[in-house]
Each structure stands twice: as C-alpha cells, then as structure tokens.
Amino acid sequence: MHRRITGKLVIATHNPGKLAEMRELLAPYGIEAISAGELGLAEPDETGDSFQANARIKAEAAAKAAQLPAFADDSGLAVDALDGAPGIYSARWAGDAKDFAGAMARIERLLQERGATAPERRTAHFVSALCVAWPDGHIEEVEARADGTLVWPPRGTAGFGYDPVFLPEGHSRTFGEMTSIEKHGLPPLGLGLSHRAKAFVKLAEICLAG
C-alpha cells in the first residue's frame, strides 16, 4: 500500500543543482525539506547497477541515519551511439571536481570518433529514478525519461550537469536555455519536459496528491 509523505523530508543529495531542483518541485506541497548536506550525513557508495538501485541506496542510507523519510534521485544521460554511456556513471564522468564541461567535451569527442554528426546519430535520453524511503524500511519508487538529441557546442547557462547539450524532443532550445518553469513544469505551465519533473509527477500521485 502506498504511503503519503508528511512532516519533514530529507533530500538525500549533496549536489547543489539537484537539491535546488528537488526543493523547487516539493515547494507547492508544503513539505519541510532538509538536505543530507545540512544534516552532515555521509554520502553512501553508489554500488547499484541501475538508476533505481542507486536511488534506493541513497534514500535508505539517509532515512536510517536521520530517522526521517528521505527522498533521493539518481539520474543520468544515456547516449545511444555510446551504447548508453555515461548512464549510471554520468556524475563520475565529471569527476570529483564536477567538471561537466569536460564530461560534455568527452562525449562530443567520442561521438565525433564514431562519425555521429547528424542529429539522428546523436539521440540520447535523460533518466531520473526517484525513491522515498522511511526509517521502518518502506519505500516508494518511480522512474521516468526525457528523450532528445545532443548539440554542440553547449548552449545556455541554466540548469546543471549535461543540460547545455541536451535538446529535448520537439523543442529548439536546450535544457540549459530553459527557465526552471519551462523545464520542470512549475505553475502556470503544468507538467514540464524534464526527466526529473516527469518522475516527480508520478511520485506526487502516490505520495503527495490529495
């Protein structure tokens, strides 16, 4: 049986960009959100073999440490011409320095080496797996994706991570060129384009709506 989120919620991330997006999505529901970083919680090793497994690891670790419900996201970019890479290793490609400019350049170099210059050879998708875990072991999980193509050079300074090279399907601007309202579906535009917004809508239906 599904469980509703009430009271305080730990956002199990130390990523400032991801934290801002998750707080933005939670804001309309009046949830008091505190981050794992603010609580001084350690980051668990992400040893899962899927986005969902890693989201669960992060949420369960934070819930156990804080003795509060915890909300985690594991997300990444999967490039078709690179056999789904960087995938669950999207953050690791940027290294400890969070050098996403370097990671984007690495992807572009690999695409060029494979002759992937035409848009139809540059398809990719973002995946977001969300998990809410409670201290008693109950979990709720959802996953969603956003399809698109990769552009070069990067465009826009909004968002974070690989947003400046990701052109969502049916649009002429990258995620890096969109406002958070456009990307995440904040009022008044409704459901947004992003993988995280789509996954959050699924989660809200079972844990927050009503």
UniProtKB/Swiss-Prot annotation:
GO terms for biological process: nucleotide metabolic process; purine nucleoside triphosphate catabolic process. Belongs to the HAM1 NTPase family. It catalyses: XTP + H2O = XMP + diphosphate + H(+); dITP + H2O = dIMP + diphosphate + H(+); ITP + H2O = IMP + diphosphate + H(+). It comes from Rhodopseudomonas palustris (strain ATCC BAA-98 / CGA009). This is dITP/XTP pyrophosphatase. Homodimer. The keyword Nucleotide-binding applies. Binds 1 Mg(2+) ion per subunit. Signal peptide: none annotated. Substrate binds at residues 13-18, 75, 160-163, 183, 195-196. The active site is at 74 (proton acceptor). GO terms for cellular component: cytosol. It comes from the Bacteria. Its cofactor is Mg(2+).
